[in-house]
Amino acid sequence: MNFIKVFIVALVFALPFSACSNYGKVLKSKDSDYKLSMADQYYQAGKYREAQQLYEELYPVFKGTDKFEELYYKDAYCFYYLKQYKDAENFFKGFLEVFPNSSRSEEVDYMHALCFYKQVDKVDLDQTNTTKSIGVMQTFINQHPGSPKIKEANEIIDKNRAQLEAKELRAADLYFKIGQYRAAAICYNALLSDYPESASGDEYKLKSLISYYKFAKLSQYSKQIERYEKVVTEYQDFAERYPQSTHLSEALEYNNLSLKKIKEIENE
């Protein structure tokens, strides 16, 4: 039994060294067709780093031949599967430039766009890649209106837009939290403008209204009437846009408080 255990352990440790040894032999080989065949085998086995190294070594050998397109195609996917999305993005783009009439062009164009999505950062970080992702995915939709990937592309755009919306909301909420009420109100209204179909539209409008109310309350006495009137205007817009909103009664309270304040100031 002990002998069997020792043998198994030795075998487990020996396999990686054997694989490394075989890969080393492939790298040293002078036979380009053999190297390409082995690169394809590594690719099929999911050993993308090994496949990639071989593919890139073979670029000058097969460039201009009928084997170059598939080599380039698989090399781009190696970067993607290794999660090196920036490099994959560049290689998929390069493929489209080198093989504009390829039967794979639609697929590769989608993968190029998908790489932008894969580089999107979390909501609390910079959203430059999110904006880029929306742009390139929309371009894909425009250029391939009949693609089976259209639904998936639209879903990615929706996710990206939701992330941008969440980022803007955080900024507005932060302004509100630190007492910068006018800036908060402007940001909440910007959310309505940027995302008119948002399910949270009435919440943004209510927060804008409340922000303007707090801004008016903290304003110089000489400017309060004008700023309470802004709250009333915001309420009228709220009631017109969202007559069935569950937040309507709360918005009405701030409207009535503002009207009361205006009357008090005018009567002094």
Predicted features along the sequence, with ranges:
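Acidic, polar-rich low-complexity tracts and alpha-helical solenoid repeat scaffolds
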Residues: 3-4, 16-268
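Bacterial N-terminal signal peptides
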Residues: 8-16
